[in-house]
């Protein structure tokens, strides 16, 4: 390792994580982002945008399974799914495993992200870009949800952190647009950072989403390269019952979907909605 250069993440001040770089596969500044993909002995291929790790081959399955199977199995009858972001294709891969879904629309602001991920992160999409149910739209997510005539049963916001291009996906304009194109009984989910270190993000999202949805909460998972504690995912719907389904119902839907997962299971689904007290306290503070 001493002979290999080190890549340091710049997300937090005063502490962080580093990766040894075995081989740089791609590094280029696009119109929107500074993007790098490199090999690391511990985590396989690593993709980072603007100095922040976005995904690694070794642990991406945790994030993508939880972002997809939790809302899709909670809904129980989703036919039309919208993914905002997700250019690496792994979110699409997991959504496409649900054969009952009829259409999958993905909106990505940067066509370059999609093209190089197909080349350099092929295990992430695993051929899902060729699914006949899939449509790719190159557009700004806020613009799309406020202009589209399509409606969706589940919306998944695979957004980056709320800096740079990702900032708009944490705004009231985006959340209002998502509510606008979400079918009755639909579910919206979004990554919302590691709540111990990024608590303000969770509080801000909760406050804004509550203007548009009757039931707003979070669920969580522990993802190694998103260090600092549990990662939270925002959850918003007008049907509170969908967040409190019994493990028996989730188990039956999981069995019917014929899924085999590496992290997600019905027990994890139910337990994921249990949140630490410090987050409850922050969300309820005046």
From Swiss-Prot:
GO terms for biological process: spermidine biosynthetic process. InterPro entries: PABS, PABS_CS, SAM-dependent_MTases_sf, Spermi_synthase, Spermidine_synt_N, Spermidine_synt_N_sf. Coiled coil: none annotated. One of its GO terms (molecular function) is spermidine synthase activity. It comes from the Bacteria. GO terms for cellular component: cytosol. Residues 5-238 form the PABS domain. Spermidine binds at residues 64, 88, 158-161. Keywords: Cytoplasm, Polyamine biosynthesis, Spermidine biosynthesis, Transferase. Catalyzes the irreversible transfer of a propylamine group from the amino donor S-adenosylmethioninamine (decarboxy-AdoMet) to putrescine (1,4-diaminobutane) to yield spermidine. PANTHER family: SPERMIDINE SYNTHASE, SPERMIDINE/SPERMINE SYNTHASE. Homodimer or homotetramer. This is Polyamine aminopropyltransferase. It comes from Klebsiella pneumoniae subsp. pneumoniae (strain ATCC 700721 / MGH 78578).
């Amino acid at each position: 390792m001493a002979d290999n250069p080190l890549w340091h993440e710049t997300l937090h001040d005063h502490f962080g994580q580093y990766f040894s770089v075995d081989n740089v596969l791609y590094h280029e500044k696009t119109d929107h982002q500074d993007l790098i993909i490199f090999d690391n002995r511990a985590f396989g291929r690593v993709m980072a945008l603007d100095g922040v790790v976005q995904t690694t081959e070794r642990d991406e399955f945790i994030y993508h399974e939880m972002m997809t199977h939790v809302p899709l199995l909670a809904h129980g009858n989703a036919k039309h799914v919208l993914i905002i972001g997700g250019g690496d294709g792994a979110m699409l891969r997991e959504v496409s495993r649900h054969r009952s879904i009829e259409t999958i629309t993905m909106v990505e602001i940067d066509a370059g992200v999609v093209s190089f991920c197909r080349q350099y992160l092929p295990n992430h999409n695993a051929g899902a870009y060729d699914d006949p149910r899939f449509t790719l739209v190159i557009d700004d997510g806020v613009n799309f949800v406020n202009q589209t005539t399509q409606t969706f049963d589940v919306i998944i916001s695979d957004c980056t952190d709320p800096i740079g291009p990702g900032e708009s996906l944490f705004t009231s304009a985006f959340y209002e647009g998502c509510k606008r194109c979400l079918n009755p009984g639909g579910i919206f989910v979004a990554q919302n950072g590691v709540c111990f270190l990024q608590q303000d993000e969770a509080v801000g999202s909760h406050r804004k989403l509550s203007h548009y949805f009757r039931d707003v909460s979070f669920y969580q998972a522990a993802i190694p390269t998103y260090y600092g504690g549990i990662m939270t995912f925002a959850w918003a719907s007008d049907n509170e019952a969908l967040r409190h389904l019994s493990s028996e119902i989730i188990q039956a839907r999981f069995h019917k979907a014929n899924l085999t997962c590496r992290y997600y299971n019905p027990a994890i689904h139910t337990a994921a909605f249990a949140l630490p007290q410090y987050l409850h306290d922050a969300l309820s503070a005046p």
